A protein has these predicted regions:
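Short linear Ser/Thr-Pro motifs
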Residues: 15, 140, 148-149
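Conserved GNAT acetyl-CoA-binding A-motif
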Residues: 132-141
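GNAT-family acyltransferases
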Residues: 1-111, 124, 128, 132, ...
């Protein structure tokens, strides 16, 4: 199985409390476990249980993004304990209707919510996208009633840009442009 790495080697970022490591095939089982929690899946899958086939497809897409684009989601690991916290990072949204299709996002196990980890990891992902990958704009999307994610978007500097309907569901979108 392709692990998404290139001859440049896997990418790892560190923050004060997290290790953000390039997505690997072994992360799939943890990803399925993450979305077994209905509260985690609530905004991503509109209240439906996430099927393991869909999560397998998503994980494979993350590996392809790392291989082809040298960016993608990171597995977020707690530095103190080594625990798998969730996914934080960049994701190319091929279905996005505009030219800027790279999104910053996060999905964390519920026990890690409310600690500022999405903010910390989101900022690191933005620095990586702008600094290492030279992106000019990074977007983020959420369900309109996902106030926690919208709050993180604002805390890391994204500004509200409007709404779109994607796959029959309304989403709000935010963006931040590279400065300098």
């Amino acid at each position: 199985m392709d692990d998404g790495t290139s001859r440049e080697g896997p990418v790892t970022l560190e923050t004060p409390r997290l290790i953000l490591r390039q997505w690997q095939p072994a992360d799939l089982d943890r990803y399925i476990e993450l979305f077994a929690d209905p509260e985690v899946a609530r905004y991503i899958f509109r209240g439906q249980r996430a099927r393991s086939e869909l999560l397998t497809e998503m994980s494979g897409n993350y590996l392809r993004q790392w291989r082809d684009l040298r960016l993608g989601p990171f597995a977020a690991i707690d530095r103190a304990t080594g625990a798998w916290v969730g996914q934080i990072g960049l994701n190319q949204l091929a279905y996005w209707p505009g030219p800027d299709q790279v999104e910053v996002g996060w999905e964390l196990h519920r026990r890690w919510w409310g600690r500022g980890l999405a903010t910390e990891g989101g900022l690191a992902a933005l620095r990586f996208g702008f600094g290492e990958r030279g992106l000019r704009r990074i977007i983020s999307t959420a369900a309109p009633d996902n106030h926690a994610s919208r709050h993180v978007m604002e805390k890391i500097g994204l500004t509200y840009r409007g709404t779109h309907v994607i796959s029959g569901a309304e989403v709000v979108w935010y963006a931040i442009d590279r400065t300098g």
